[in-house]
Regions:
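Mid-to-C-terminal Rossmann-like scaffold of FAD/NAD(P)H-dependent oxidoreductases
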Residues: 1, 8, 283-396, 428-431, ...
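A Rossmann-like FAD-binding core segment of flavoenzymes
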Residues: 25-27, 69, 75-96, 103, ...
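Rhodanese-like catalytic fold shared by cysteine-dependent sulfurtransferases
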Residues: 420-423, 427, 431, 438-452, ...
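Beta1-alpha1 glycine-rich phosphate/pyrophosphate-binding loop at the start
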Residues: 1-75, 79, 160, 166-190, ...
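Hydrophobic Val/Ile/Leu positions in short beta-strands of Rossmann-like dinucleotide-binding domains
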Residues: 5, 30, 131, 155-156, ...
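Rossmann-like dinucleotide-binding cores of NAD(P)H-dependent redox enzymes
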Residues: 59, 152-153, 160-217, 298-302, ...
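Glycine-rich dinucleotide-binding loop and its adjacent helix/turn
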Residues: 110-172, 208, 261, 266-268, ...
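FAD-site-proximal beta/loop scaffold in flavoenzymes
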Residues: 125-149, 219-226, 233-309, 404, ...
């Protein structure tokens, strides 16, 4: 059997290698227009940042090494330009000479992948404008940054690739601005409130992020000098285009293949509508494991799984690819984000009666030296308690939380299946009650009515407007809120009416839940706990008592302070010193400001 595979990165090389292991008699040929095969595409940003020192580390196998290990014939520098399915031939052009020839096949596998989308704007051909797809791209970017001592860069696209590139450019000492046309970062990957938290974190880390912004033109003569956007002109010496990807399927448009928006449609055995033609990887439309509906999920991990399944199918094994969950994880400066399954919005659109929770927890024993945090958002079906999705933020191993959810969703788990799961525990690794299980407990409490809460999304939308904020922290920390010492609550609380709407807020949510439990037993009927508490939400109380007069506001601003427009009486100031010293006049100004009520 002669099997021709077009494309030699993840899905292509996986399919070919598995084919030869399953059937040594098969004649397997891989054709690719690139000079490299089987390279670590997901590792390219880390080469740019210098975390990976040598380009060769990105090459899993050279063509010669791969051929020797697997018995697969590899032809590089060969670009497929047409498919003649009726003749069982692919027309291939030599990249260097332009010569064309026909390759016959018994079975054809299309693993042509995807490339960064090219923006329909002026200036994409300027020096200093790059995309990120191959090791050559990464090498060119790194060399350009170092040779030109780049100070400012703009990244177009706030998906996984764009954010990874931004982090690694920052590691090279470059000031980075990320822009995206969508209203949030990581669109269709995480829900809005999770994206808001991550965006704020990036800003704190020194990466500027502008969402809801379109690139209109790339400025410059010979080399890029800036990007004209709907938000204004952004000066830069380097521009990375990472605004999504599109399948490399243009040459297949007149082949008779059934396609949708450039993706190849396949069944569960990875077969196309054409006889003896199969496809896998970033160029195919598969299905979502939860909804069963079509989903394009271009990930290296999925491409490998699809390639393995396809190889088994081609060698006679009765096997089907179950689809994707869109599982992914991304590393930002001092923050990791992981996700799998459906977002809240996607679950609602799929017809589920959705219930969610946002739960901050420790990621290991709080007293252990490198203890960090998880913020876990669980998405489930209210009636069946079926787990539908998870999103996790944290400064540690968020992938372990995501992987638990992946296995649960794969097995059709309901929340109760996790209650007594015997997860590994030791202080250096986890908490006595696993963080994932803690989040499940909280969501179950919410479903059965033991916890009445307000989600961060609801809080951000203004649902707390008519609520009195009650600070339940260890010490008072919310300006303008009513402070309640939890340890002293043994009955009714003076100043809090039992019919009053009370929003209970603490550091992470536990103390708020404890107070709600007590207050409900004392007859308080309208208490609500803010999910995520102060750890996740920016909690502010509108002060209606200490309104600053216009005259006083003018006086304070004259001292060099800026008014915080989100409050009625708060001003912000900054002291810039020279070698750590301030003048006598500056000292008097600071002292006067400190005395302000």
């Amino acid at each position: 059997m002669k099997i021709l595979i077009i494309g030699g990165v993840a899905a292509g090389t996986k399919t070919a290698a598995k084919l030869k292991r399953e059937d040594r008699s098969a004649e397997v040929t891989v054709i690719t227009k690139d000079r490299d095969i089987s390279y670590a595409g997901c590792g390219l940003p880390y080469y740019v940042g210098g975390l990976i020192e040598n380009r060769e580390e990105l090459i899993v196998n050279t063509p010669a090494k791969y051929a020797g290990l697997t018995g697969v014939e590899v032809k590089t520098g060969k670009e497929a330009i047409a498919l003649c399915a009726d003749k069982k031939e692919v027309i291939v052009k030599d990249v260097e000479t332009g010569a064309e020839e026909a390759y016959g096949y018994d079975k054809l596998v299309l693993t042509v992948g995807a490339s960064p989308a090219k923006l329909p704007i002026e200036g994409t051909d300027l020096s200093g404008v790059f995309q990120m797809r191959t090791p050559d791209d990464a090498e060119n970017i790194r060399s350009y940054v170092e040779e030109n001592q780049v100070k400012k860069a703009v990244v177009i696209g706030a998906g996984f690739i764009g954010l990874e590139v931004a982090e690694n450019l920052k590691a090279k000492g470059v000031q980075v601005t990320v822009i995206d046309f969508a209203s949030q970062i990581l669109p269709n990957i995480v829900d809005a409130e999770v994206a808001v938290y991550a965006k704020k974190h990036l800003l704190k880390e020194g990466i500027r992020v502008i969402t809801g912004t379109k690139a209109d033109a790339i400025m410059g003569n010979d080399h890029v000098t800036g990007v004209k956007t709907s938000a204004g002109l952004l000066r830069c010496e380097l521009l990375i285009m990472a605004a999504g990807i599109r399948p490399n399927t243009d040459f297949l448009q007149d082949s008779g293949l059934e396609m949708f928006k450039g993706t190849i449609l396949v069944d569960k055995t990875m077969k196309t509508n054409l006889e003896d033609v199969y496809a896998a990887g970033d160029c195919v439309m598969v299905t979502n494991r939860i909804t069963g509906k079509p989903q394009w999920s271009p990930m290296g991990s999925s491409a490998n799984l699809e390639g393995r399944t396809l190889a088994q199918v081609l060698t006679g094994t009765k096997k089907e690819y179950p689809g994707v969950l869109g599982t992914g994880v991304v590393k930002l400066p001092n923050l990791n984000i992981g996700r799998t399954g459906l977002t809240e919005e996607q679950a609602k659109n799929a017809g589920y009666d959705v219930v969610t929770v946002v739960a901050p927890t420790d990621d290991k024993a709080h007293y252990y030296p490198d203890a960090g945090f998880f913020i876990t958002k669980l998405i489930a079906d209210r009636e069946s308690h079926k787990l539908l999705g998870v999103q996790v933020l944290g400064n540690g191993a968020v992938d372990k939380m995501v992987d638990i959810a992946v296995m649960g969703i794969n097995m059709g788990a309901v929340l109760e299946d996790f209650e007594n799961a015997d997860f590994a525990y030791a202080p250096p690794f986890s908490t006595a009650i696993h963080p994932f299980v803690q989040a499940v407990y909280i969501l179950l409490n919410k479903i059965n009515g033991n916890l009445v809460s307000m989600t961060p999304a609801e809080y951000a939308a203004g649902k707390a407007k008519d609520y009195k904020v009650v600070d339940v922290g260890l010490t008072p920390s919310i300006r303008g809120a009513v402070y309640v010492n939890l340890s002293q609550v043994n009955g009714e609380i003076e100043g809090l009416d039992k019919e009053e709407k009370l929003l209970l807020v603490c550091a992470k949510g536990k103390r708020g839940y404890f107070l709600q439990n007590r207050l409900r037993s004392y007859g308080y009927k309208n208490t609500v706990v803010l999910e995520g508490a102060q750890f996740f939400n920016d909690v502010k109380v509108q002060n209606t008592e200490n309104v600053v007069s216009p005259e006083e506001a003018t006086r304070v601003k004259a001292l060099g302070f800026l008014r915080d427009k989100t409050t009625l009486d708060k001003f912000n100031g900054r002291v810039i010193t020279r070698n750590g010293k301030i003048t006598a006049d500056e000292a008097r100004t600071i002292a006067e400001a400190e005395k302000l009520p």
